[in-house]
Amino acid sequence: MDVRANLRSIRISPRKVRLVTDLIRNKKVGDAIVILNNTNKKSSVPVQKLVKSAESIAVNNNGLDADRLFIKEIFVNERPTLKRFRPRAHGRAYEILKRTSHITVTVSDGQQ
């Protein structure tokens, strides 16, 4: 059975979040949490919270065995970018793009 959890509008660039999510794809949930604990990236903290949330949903709401859970699917989508401007010399302004992400994780126990 598959269980899905979402984290929406996180203020980290999708490119940076994908570096972390690629490390834990198709891993057991326990192993993924250990990997995220030892990853020195800003995005590893919210991804770890999301994986723990998906695990608790699977165990508490659906009665799945926590030891059999693995990350079946994890992906990062880009949400609309916040555009800001930085003043520059001679009355010009440079655009700053503040990128944000949506993260979706699916955990499964391997059964239908």
From Swiss-Prot:
GO terms for molecular function: rRNA binding; structural constituent of ribosome. GO terms for biological process: translation. Keywords: Ribonucleoprotein, Ribosomal protein, RNA-binding, rRNA-binding. Transmembrane segments: none annotated. It holds the Pfam family Ribosomal_L22. GO terms for cellular component: cytosolic large ribosomal subunit. It comes from the Bacteria. Signal peptide: none annotated. This protein binds specifically to 23S rRNA; its binding is stimulated by other ribosomal proteins, e.g. L4, L17, and L20. It is important during the early stages of 50S assembly. It makes multiple contacts with different domains of the 23S rRNA in the assembled 50S subunit and ribosome. The globular domain of the protein is located near the polypeptide exit tunnel on the outside of the subunit, while an extended beta-hairpin is found that lines the wall of the exit tunnel in the center of the 70S ribosome. Belongs to the universal ribosomal protein uL22 family. Part of the 50S ribosomal subunit. This is Large ribosomal subunit protein uL22. The lineage of its organism: Bacteria, Bacillati, Mycoplasmatota, Mollicutes, Entomoplasmatales.
